[in-house]
């Protein structure tokens, strides 16, 4: 399924995803078949007739098949002797496109499915037939994001037809190969993000049911606690090159302005009081016998 980070503009969806990718880049390298453009799982080399034996011995479930390029190399260069195929280790990298694929939003005139699944190298078509794996250039987001993560940036800004590859990737764990080639196994996490208005517009269209069924939305709200907003500003200031003196309570005042601009008006409390209540403070307004319940304020804002 697709993990969808959905929320208002500036809530931190992209920043959250950047932290996920950074954690992946700092994680341990993975083993994969040398020379494979999708960093193939080495256990895919095991023939299906022997997989049950390997699974019992290793205690793991072997899923998936070799990509067309590795299948060709195994047959042509190693005479189907899978134990001779070299295996190496490599880490994850966004810049080098290793295990992390990013799909930016594109307009309808420039949408090309090769961004997702790669393409055929036209320069090789005069030497090899169309169904020869050597003409494949598996550099799409679902290829480089195999065994890692694929990020769909502002996913619903794309045309719905552009997202059809996501259906097979989530339902069958397979993505189509460019040209006249077999489907390619995909083992990765798909994370998308979008704004609230785009999500509401997308789910309101009944023709999008196939993709909607595969989406798990996670709401990323604004920070409504004053103390947490101050921490965010303090962290950003500490990481910046800004070294000038900052007057006392500057961050608190800026945080108050930000938080109060996000709160909806209510007849139960004035904006400052509501901000204090959301911050966990016990506040009793003048003329009231008991304190205002934060649950009542949240229910009213929904």
Give the residues covered by each predicted segment.
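Conserved ASCE/P-loop NTPase catalytic core
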Residues: 1-302
């Amino acid at each position: 399924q697709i993990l969808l980070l959905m929320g208002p503009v500036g809530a931190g969806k992209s920043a959250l995803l950047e932290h996920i990718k950074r954690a992946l880049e700092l994680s341990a390298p993975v083993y994969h078949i040398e020379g494979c453009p999708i960093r193939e799982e080495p256990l895919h080399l095991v023939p299906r007739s022997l997989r049950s034996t390997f699974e019992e011995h290793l205690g793991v479930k072997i899923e998936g098949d070799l990509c067309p390029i590795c299948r060709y190399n195994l047959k042509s260069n190693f005479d189907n002797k899978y134990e001779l195929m070299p295996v190496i280790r490599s880490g994850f990298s966004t810049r080098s496109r290793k295990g992390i694929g990013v799909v930016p939003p594109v307009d309808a005139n420039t949408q090309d499915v090769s961004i997702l699944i790669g393409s055929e190298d036209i320069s090789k078509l005069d030497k090899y037939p169309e169904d020869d794996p050597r003409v494949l250039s598996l550099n799409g987001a679902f290829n480089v994001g195999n065994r890692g993560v694929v990020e769909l940036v502002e996913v619903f800004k794309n045309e719905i037809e552009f997202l059809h590859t996501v259906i097979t990737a989530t339902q069958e764990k397979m993505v189509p190969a460019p040209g006249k080639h077999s489907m390619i196994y995909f083992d990765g996490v798909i994370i998308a993000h979008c704004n609230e208005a785009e999500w509401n517009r997308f789910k309101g269209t009944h023709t999008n049911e196939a993709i909607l069924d595969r989406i798990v939305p996670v709401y990323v709200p604004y920070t409504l606690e004053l103390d947490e907003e101050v921490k965010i500003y303090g962290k950003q200031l500490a990481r910046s090159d800004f070294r000038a003196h900052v007057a006392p309570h500057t961050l608190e005042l800026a945080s108050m302005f930000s938080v109060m601009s996000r709160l909806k008006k209510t007849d139960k409390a004035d904006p400052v009081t509501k901000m204090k209540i959301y911050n966990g403070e016990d506040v009793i307004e003048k003329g009231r016998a008991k304190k205002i319940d934060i649950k009542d304020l949240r229910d009213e804002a929904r």
